Swiss-Prot record:
Part of the 30S ribosomal subunit. Contacts proteins S5 and S12. This is Small ribosomal subunit protein uS8. GO terms for cellular component: ribonucleoprotein complex; ribosome. SUPFAM superfamilies: Ribosomal protein S8. PROSITE patterns: RIBOSOMAL_S8 (PS00053). The gene is rpsH. InterPro entries: Ribosomal_uS8, Ribosomal_uS8_CS, Ribosomal_uS8_sf. It comes from Buchnera aphidicola subsp. Acyrthosiphon kondoi. One of the primary rRNA binding proteins, it binds directly to 16S rRNA central domain where it helps coordinate assembly of the platform of the 30S subunit. Keywords: Ribonucleoprotein, Ribosomal protein, RNA-binding, rRNA-binding. GO terms for molecular function: rRNA binding; structural constituent of ribosome. GO terms for biological process: translation. Belongs to the universal ribosomal protein uS8 family. It holds the Pfam family Ribosomal_S8. PANTHER family: 40S RIBOSOMAL PROTEIN S15A.
């Protein structure tokens, strides 16, 4: 059976892994998932990630905790296959008044809402992370 929304699956694996205090979570890899993982690492929401190759590459995310609590308080899918959400550069949302991030897919790649605003780019709002 094929997966309908692989990005939602990725976010759910992160959410469930942190709820169960797992060190790392694994999932099938794709270019978009790697780009999202890179943004999460740059923003300090995950420790690290690596791709274990082969014919079916696997993405492993090393989860991050602070004083025993998960760093990711909430992670929420916004644009989904049945309802895509696009925003212009001046309409990009501020998550938790700037404390969280919105992951945005732009014409220049996947980046945070802050980076997209600085670059003057709009795009598809993939998810909110706080």
């Amino acid at each position: 059976m094929s997966m309908q929304d692989p990005i939602a699956d990725m976010l759910t694996r992160i959410r469930n892994g942190q709820a169960a205090n797992k060190v790392a979570v694994t999932m099938p890899s794709s270019k978009l998932k790697v780009a999202i993982a890179n943004v999460l690492k740059e923003e300090g929401f995950i420790e690290d990630f690596k791709i274990e190759g082969g014919t079916k590459p696997v993405l492993e995310l090393v989860l991050k905790y602070f004083q025993g609590n998960a760093v990711v308080e909430s992670i929420q899918r916004i644009s989904r296959p049945g309802l895509r959400i696009y925003k212009k550069k001046d309409e990009l949302p501020k998550v938790m008044a700037g404390l969280g991030i919105a992951v945005v897919s732009t014409s220049k790649g996947v980046m945070t809402d802050r980076a997209a605003r600085q670059a003057g780019l709009g795009g598809e709002i993939i998810c909110y992370v706080a």
